[in-house]
């Protein structure tokens, strides 16, 4: 809408959608959608959600990027991205407030009615905002020409595709590791009420910090911390129940926070000009959906255990390597410093740091030898037990897949 319609028509189209969303209220599901026991659960849930909150959710989710685009038109020179941080503050408050302040004190009918009233108020506020745009000059054509000229002069096709790929991959990886960590904590470790809220709250906090401003994300701090915490994750994985439950939660949640800070911090670094803001958020949403589909649908069909967490950690490492290959100060060309490492990533141990100027790359054979020697040395130096003697464990021909993933992470 922002790219293909002038400002006036954008207001009209979005206003029509807001009115249609009001017509669908209240969001109580229809009686015809009550399950009979013969339906596919996933399909039935999707039908209920689409029929009840489909249009209101569509309007709510599209308003945020559209309002940011309008803000950029009304206030040239001011960054609209801080509004995204504020929207995530609202999401965090709703996450923490609903189970403690709303659900215990209101019936479901009361919740639906109050939510409907809130939606009506929301539409009125959007209407006032649209009315205030009447004094904004229509600069869409000039902006489009400037943006097209800028793209032609400064951006190659390869660069645009690379950055578009990062817009998709970074949020996908963040969502995947969020869901993988949640599964790890709530299904593989302990069933604790409201424990699922902790990973989601940390996930939202990383969005808030990253999009509040570039000064809060420092590569040289977060990437080394994540590497150190990876060692803690591996240690907890090998030790298992020997580690206290609080320690496990701290390690896994710390890895989640740092991973999401890197993904979302790099995502903010690659933010476009306001003219492409809506495309940016659309790609972020698509990436988040892909990450969620991988964990929720694809991983259970492919794996017998919670391998999505291990794969998500691996993906974070891969993205860190690839993002470090981009020069953040001069994106006029894609400078893949890590391209040779990427070709052998699945069989290599690569550490790339701009400040320490260290690049360590090994072949698959060298990595396997390193793993064997390291495990042998650890067995000799400390009591490193995972159920069987390590030298015997490595001779087992039919290793569980999770152990292979752990070896790969090492």
Regions inferred by a protein language model and the residue ranges of each:
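Alpha-helical transmembrane segments of multi-pass membrane proteins
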Residues: 1-410
């Amino acid at each position: 809408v922002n790219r293909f319609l002038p400002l006036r028509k954008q207001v009209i189209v979005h206003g029509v959608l807001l009115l249609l969303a009001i017509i669908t209220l209240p969001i109580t599901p229809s009686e015809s959608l009550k399950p009979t026991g013969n339906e596919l659960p996933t399909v039935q849930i999707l039908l209920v959600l689409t029929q009840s909150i489909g249009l209101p959710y569509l309007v709510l989710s599209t308003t945020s990027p559209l309002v940011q685009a309008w803000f950029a038109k009304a206030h040239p020179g001011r960054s609209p991205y801080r509004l995204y941080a504020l929207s995530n503050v609202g999401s965090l408050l709703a996450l923490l407030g609903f189970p403690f302040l709303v659900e215990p004190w209101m019936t479901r009918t009361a919740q639906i009615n109050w939510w409907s009233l809130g939606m009506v108020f929301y539409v009125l506020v959007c209407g006032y905002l649209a009315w205030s745009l009447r004094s904004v000059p229509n600069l869409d054509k000039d902006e489009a020409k400037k943006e097209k000229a800028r793209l032609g002069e400064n951006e190659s096709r390869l660069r645009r595709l690379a950055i578009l790929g990062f817009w998709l991959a970074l949020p996908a990886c963040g969502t995947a590791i969020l869901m993988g960590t949640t599964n790890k904590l709530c299904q593989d470790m302990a069933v604790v009420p409201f424990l699922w809220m902790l990973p989601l709250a940390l996930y939202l906090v990383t969005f808030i910090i990253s999009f509040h401003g570039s000064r809060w994300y420092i590569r040289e701090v977060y990437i080394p911390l994540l590497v150190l915490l990876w060692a803690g994750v591996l240690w907890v994985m090998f030790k298992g129940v020997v580690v206290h439950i609080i320690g496990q939660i701290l390690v896994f949640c710390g890895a989640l926070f740092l991973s999401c800070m890197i993904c979302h911090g790099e995502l903010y670094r690659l933010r476009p000009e306001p003219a492409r803001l809506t495309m940016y958020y659309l790609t972020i949403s698509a990436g988040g959906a892909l990450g969620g589909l991988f964990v929720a649908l694809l991983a259970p069909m492919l794996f017998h255990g919670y391998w999505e967490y291990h794969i998500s950690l691996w993906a974070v490492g891969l993205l860190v390597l690839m993002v470090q290959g981009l020069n953040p100060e001069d994106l006029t060309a894609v400078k893949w410093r890590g391209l040779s490492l990427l070709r052998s990533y699945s069989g290599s141990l690569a550490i790339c740091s701009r400040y320490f100027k260290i690049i360590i790359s090994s072949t698959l054979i060298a990595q396997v030898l390193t793993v064997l020697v390291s495990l042998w040395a650890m067995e000799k130096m400390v009591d490193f037990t995972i159920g069987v003697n390590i030298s015997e464990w490595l001779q087992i021909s039919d290793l569980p897949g999770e152990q292979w993933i752990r070896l790969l992470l090492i």
